[in-house]
Swiss-Prot record:
Active site: R290
Lineage: Eukaryota, Viridiplantae, Streptophyta, Embryophyta, Tracheophyta
GO biological process terms held by the UniProt record: flower development; gibberellin biosynthetic process; response to light stimulus; unidimensional cell growth
Molecular function (Gene Ontology), one example: gibberellin 20-oxidase activity
PROSITE patterns linked: FE2OG_OXY
Protein name: Gibberellin 20 oxidase 1-D
Amino acid sequence: MVQPVFDAAVLSGRADIPSQFIWPEGESPTPDAAEELHVPLIDIGGMLSGDPAAAAEVTRLVGEACERHGFFQVVNHGIDAELLADAHRCVDNFFTMPLPEKQRALRHPGESCGYASSFTGRFASKLPWKETLSFRSCPSDPALVVDYIVATLGEDHRRLGEVYARYCSEMSRLSLEIMEVLGESLGVGRAHYRRFFEGNDSIMRLNYYPPCQRPLETLGTGPHCDPTSLTILHQDNVGGLQVHTEGRWRSIRPRADAFVVNIGDTFMALSNGRYKSCLHRAVVNSRVPRKSLAFFLCPEMDKVVAPPGTLVDAANPRAYPDFTWRSLLDFTQKHYRADMKTLEVFSSWIVQQQQPQPART
């Protein structure tokens, strides 16, 4: 049987769409999503400037948002506007290449890095209408991004690798600053989570959502919670990000000067369930492609994920067992399709794995 191919140049103009992309009624885009979700706008530079009043206000706003739905936006982040523009241009440059060229970086089953489209993965229904390119980023290995891009796509794409190496370095810096805010808001101090993530082993992902002539029947990305620790997203000027909160879907409007930040499952465990990893999705439209840059902060692969002792007491017992990021990543890549219950299902799986197996007779 020939493997189907997601060729955006062909599919984006089709009046019908393959059945694998059609989502059941009740899961497809809904009219209420036109309502905007107003999330706090956090001045991260003000927080770190030493102004006690600014720091207190940022801490309060972040804490309230993370206990409700886990989403906020960050401005005054220090990311150079030209670097952002370069990063978005490189998204265009990569995804408009002929399909065989993109497939040189094809992601293999069970892996989290490489080029992927809807038919690359292990699922056959409710497929996402998108293409992605993902790669690792580690502060301890500055050459990692460039080496990966050159090894998979060729020397001609070295500049693309250099742009994203710079971008990932800035994302790592920003994520550690956000960790200071999260630590302060949880009462464990600025240094706790910053230290935990200083040696991060993170994932950078370029998202490309082609136009779709049946946008009310499919989704760019289905409803899910991020299994990672923290997501820092920069959207282009085409809306599409939606968050499920208070029983309905609402949109976060793009802002060129802001990054959308959301809590992932791993940080929810690190906060002992205090901060929420919230259900979200991406919708598509029939007119123009949508592009976004997503940096997923992750701890080192074998670092034990456990909340600080100050967040655990008789009234707030441990919400999740100890685990490593490697084990959760492996679970979502090989055993489970990430959704709103990933962390709960994974926790049960961990406990089951730790139980002694009955002897065979």
